[in-house]
Amino acid sequence: SSAASDVYKRQMLLYVVMAIFCSLGLITENRLWPMVAASLAPTGCLMAFLALWTGSLWGRPTWGAYWVWDARLTSALILFFFYLGYIALQNANPDWRRADKACAVIGIVGVINVPIVYFSVQWWNTLHQGASITASGSSIHPVMLWALALMVIGFWLYTFAVTFVRLRSVILERERNQEWAQQLALKGEL
């Protein structure tokens, strides 16, 4: 379905953006970039989970099974595992700098899987349909297209809001011993 396709695309885009910030963190050694990547990972992981879960619920009546080892499903599951690995590694190491470097490797290596997820329906004979919305038009009824557009806007607003709230939390957690953070805490501005 188009809604599930949008969730697939969102998880892939979030992973690519996360990998970019991982790369920037390694190249520039700026502390902010890994914090942004760490803030994106849980939302991307949630989107990956939602795509797999709702896809399996849709797949049961459509394919007769909750799970089939389809190229799109399998590559999306691998991307979900990359998200889980990133989050687990980030939380397993109390030294933020070391965790950021190790997570950057996962972020950069995992981005190789993104084109596989995206192009799997074109490269292999899969159970998934091709794109419903293309440059040449849409195969979706206009009423459903509007509903899809509203859902996409809502999900993106949610994604931005949650990511920025999480980024604020990560910054304050990592910088809690810095003078500026302590002064803001004393003023009650946190």
Predicted regions and their residues:
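Membrane-interface capping segments at transmembrane-helix boundaries
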Residues: 161-175
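Membrane-interface transmembrane-helix boundary segments in multi-pass integral membrane proteins
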Residues: 5, 123-157, 179-190
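Hydrophobic alpha-helical membrane-insertion segments
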Residues: 103-119
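Membrane-interface helix-loop-helix modules in multi-pass inner-membrane proteins
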Residues: 43-88
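A glycine-rich, hydrophobic loop/mini-helix early in the fold
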Residues: 9-59
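Membrane-interfacial loop-to-helix junctions in multi-pass inner-membrane proteins
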Residues: 29-46, 66-69, 94-108
